[in-house]
Structure formats: structure tokens, C-alpha cells
């Protein structure tokens, strides 16, 4: 099975990228983040002829996630059980019958957080990671495999930072989000739960592979970016991981998202 995660940065703006992903990679499951469209206005004309079941959890103008699956899921869940009616639309889950067992797929657009000093955005990021952790520990049956994918907005190690050492130091000094010690501690709890980074499993020392590139500074042109999009899997799946990648060819298209899709394949 092949899984692709892509922060599309506006579904209506980038149907050409979604179509190219499907044509080239033929994934079984696609997780989209930042679709920026309300559920009642979802553009089914973009997705109806692609060969997928389509599920979404969105709001007008911001955030929003979607799952596209070749097979019909047994269950779809939108949001965390602890979400209130004002919660941002950032997470969607599906249970799929697979050769690996009953697989829970969690697709998330994790808060960016802005900076340690931000009064609302930084605590919101911490809460989102805590809500995910609580969901895993209280709701998920660990005997079943699980895959978490999305724009997680954290660079887990210094290998995942490609913005230059001066910028790295400045971001840390000013408390800018992506690789703060607190963020890495939240992320580490996912590893402690038993999840593995599919990309790192097959590329343990790669330090030049990134999934996000800043528009304004034209970071894509000289490979200046961050690896903040991830596919994390439980051990049973990690053992079956045969290939991973970052689809830079899709990022190189006209009118692209600032993120590149990432993918992982399991056999």
C-alpha cells in the first residue's frame, strides 16, 4: 500500500498538483492538509473522477483536511473526541481493512505555533499534540497498526533543518517555531508511544531532504527548507516499509503549494 501526505495549500487553487500526484504515484490513500474549503462548499468536481472515496473536514478560508481512499473505509472520524464546536478543522481519521490488519489512518494539519511568545498559537500547538497523545493512549487499540501523516510543523532533528546555521540559531534565539526544544519533546512522545518515522527508517542520516520551502525567499531553487511533513507508523508497519520519498517533481510544478508531497509504501 502506498500513502501520500500533501499540504496542498488550497484545494481549489491546485487541482493540477493533485491530479499529477495520482497519475504518477497511484497512491492507495491520500491525506490532504490545508484544503481551505468549508464542508458545504467542497469542490467535488475536482475529485469525483479520480477513482477515490473522498472524505473531508473543513472550514471556510483556513485549515481543513481531506482523506482520499481507494477502498471504502469501515469508519471515518472527524476531529478529536475532546474537540468543542469552535475547534479548528485539522484532523480526520479512517479505519481501513488491510493486509496488515485493521489500520487506523490519522491525517492532520498540525498548528504552526508561530513562536514561543505567541499567546494563543503556541499553546494551541501544544494542546493539539496533547490531544493526539491522549487519543492514542485512550482510544487506539495498540494491537492494530496505525499511520499518522500530515503537516506536523516540527523538524524532529537537526538533520531536518535546511535553512542555514545562522537562521537556525536565530530561530532558536527568538523562539520561532519548528524545532524548539519544547516542540521536540511533544514529538518525542509519539516515538515513545511506539511510532517510527518512515522516512528516517530508510534514510537515517540524510540531511538534504526537505518538504517545505519558503515562497518569498525562493527556497526551493537552492534546496533551502525544512522537513516538517511526516508519515509515522507503528512497528508492525515500519517493518513492512519498502520505499519512501519526497515528491519534489510536484513541488517544481507551476503555481505549487509551498510543501512537497511525501509518500511511503508498505508491502
UniProtKB/Swiss-Prot annotation:
Sites annotated Important for catalytic activity: 229
Alphabetical UniProt keywords: DNA damage, DNA repair, Exonuclease, Hydrolase, Magnesium, Metal-binding, Nuclease
Binding site for Mg(2+) 1: 34, 258
First-level EC class: hydrolase
Function (record text): Major apurinic-apyrimidinic endonuclease of E.coli. It removes the damaged DNA at cytosines and guanines by cleaving on the 3'-side of the AP site by a beta-elimination reaction.
Subunit: Monomer.
Entry-linked PROSITE patterns: AP_NUCLEASE_F1_1, AP_NUCLEASE_F1_2, AP_NUCLEASE_F1_3, AP_NUCLEASE_F1_4
CDD domains, per the entry: ExoIII-like_AP-endo
Sequence similarity: Belongs to the DNA repair enzymes AP/ExoA family.
One BP annotation, GO: DNA repair
Site feature location: Interaction with DNA substrate: 259
Catalytic activity: Exonucleolytic cleavage in the 3'- to 5'-direction to yield nucleoside 5'-phosphates
Residues noted as binding Mg(2+) 2 in the record, renumbered to the chain: 151, 153
Organism: Haemophilus influenzae (strain ATCC 51907 / DSM 11121 / KW20 / Rd)
Cofactor note: Probably binds two magnesium or manganese ions per subunit.
InterPro entries: AP_endonuc_1, AP_endonuclease_F1_BS, AP_endonuclease_F1_CS, Endo/exonu/phosph_ase_sf, Endo/exonuclease/phosphatase, ExoIII-like
Cofactors that this protein relies on: Mg(2+); Mn(2+)
Annotated active site: 109, 151
EC identifiers of the protein: 3.1.11.2
Gene Ontology MF, one: DNA binding
Protein name: Exodeoxyribonuclease III
